[in-house]
Amino acid sequence: MAKDIRVLLYYLYTPIENAEQFAADHLAFCKSIGLKGRILVADEGINGTVSGDYETTQKYMDYVHSLPGMEELWFKIDEESEQAFKKMFVRYKKEIVHLGLEDNDFDNDINPLETTGAYLSPKEFKEALLDKDTVVLDTRNDYEYDLGHFRGAIRPDIRNFREXPQWVRDNKEKFMDKRVVVYCTGGVRCEKFSGWMVREGYKDVGQLHGGIATYGKDPEVQGELWDGKMYVFDERIAVDVNHVNPTIVGKDWFDGTPCERYVNCGNPFCNRRILTSEENEDKYLRGCSHECRVHPRNRYVSKNELTQAEVIERLAAIGESLDQAATV
């Protein structure tokens, strides 16, 4: 199948005047050329992933590079056979990356233009992975790590990125005096997180420049030492990184078998991302727990128009019943 669609991943921390109006104008331009994607605009900068054919994406890159302060913006490009998005969204937010510092009564937010970790090339990052005296931290959400991660990287005991600062403070003694390098998908989260670590007093903090997306495309490292796939926030869900010796590290939520297929829990009030096969999705009604399986608004049940008798039958097959006590 021909790969005639390009997916552009990018970000830039740069002051944007009248960012709300900028977002509205940006959306109008994107729609005028038929671009699809999701873009966040804030006073501190821009962060987006978009897709379209070659002509459309080229028009977009030319347009962005014509904007004041964005002449050198770095686009990371994937070639795909299908669109990565169905619609076009451009939204104004307070921040393009929310680290949650103010939410947790920490210090003020980080400005990466003033404070950030040292940039590491893919080659330098690979060397750091092989250095036993270097601590490698994954700064992404838990479900991103579970699908794929760098070999030997620490998985913080957190659900999402915003919990990372508190986790680091709780585990400070483990790596305060060591070299620490961090990584994320495209680099935008690491700019802030590494800067926060510098401000916390860590003396030697590095970040993978361009993120995992760049590491996988580098002709020298070719994604080596990455295990599994990289989670992406578009229709693709998962993309390859390691082109040397790829492996599967994802495990099915229900039986632990190798799996790289993500779905959202059928309970809309849970919505946890879980790895599971189509067979187990059907078997467990796409519910990550008994409570979610029997929830009255379970989306899997409603989508498949299952009768109560059919739900009871499937629950019985896994040793559960409608009226049993919830186990979560």
UniProtKB/Swiss-Prot annotation:
InterPro entries, per database record: Rhodanese-like_dom (IPR001763), Rhodanese-like_dom_sf (IPR036873), Rhodanese_C (IPR022111), TrhO (IPR020936), TRHO_N (IPR040503)
Catalytic machinery residues: 184 (cysteine persulfide intermediate)
Record carries keyword Transport: no
Entry keyword Glycoprotein: no
Any Pfam family the entry gives: Rhodanese_C
Superkingdom to which the source organism belongs: Bacteria
Reactions this protein catalyses: uridine(34) in tRNA + AH2 + O2 = 5-hydroxyuridine(34) in tRNA + A + H2O
EC number: 1.14.-.-
Gene3D superfamilies: 3.30.70.100, Rhodanese-like domain (3.40.250.10)
Matches recorded under SMART domains: RHOD (SM00450)
Gene Ontology biological-process annotations: tRNA modification
The entry's keywords: Oxidoreductase, tRNA processing
Boundaries of every Rhodanese domain copy: 130-224
UniProt GO MF annotations: oxidoreductase activity, acting on paired donors, with incorporation or reduction of molecular oxygen
UniProt function note: Catalyzes oxygen-dependent 5-hydroxyuridine (ho5U) modification at position 34 in tRNAs.
Similarity comment text for this entry: Belongs to the TrhO family.
PANTHER family, sorted: RHODANESE-LIKE DOMAIN-CONTAINING PROTEIN 7-RELATED (PTHR43268:SF3), THIOSULFATE SULFURTRANSFERASE/RHODANESE-LIKE DOMAIN-CONTAINING PROTEIN 2 (PTHR43268)
Protein name according to UniProt: tRNA uridine(34) hydroxylase
Species per Swiss-Prot/TrEMBL record: Streptococcus pneumoniae serotype 19F (strain G54)
Organism lineage: Bacteria, Bacillati, Bacillota, Bacilli, Lactobacillales
Gene behind this protein: trhO
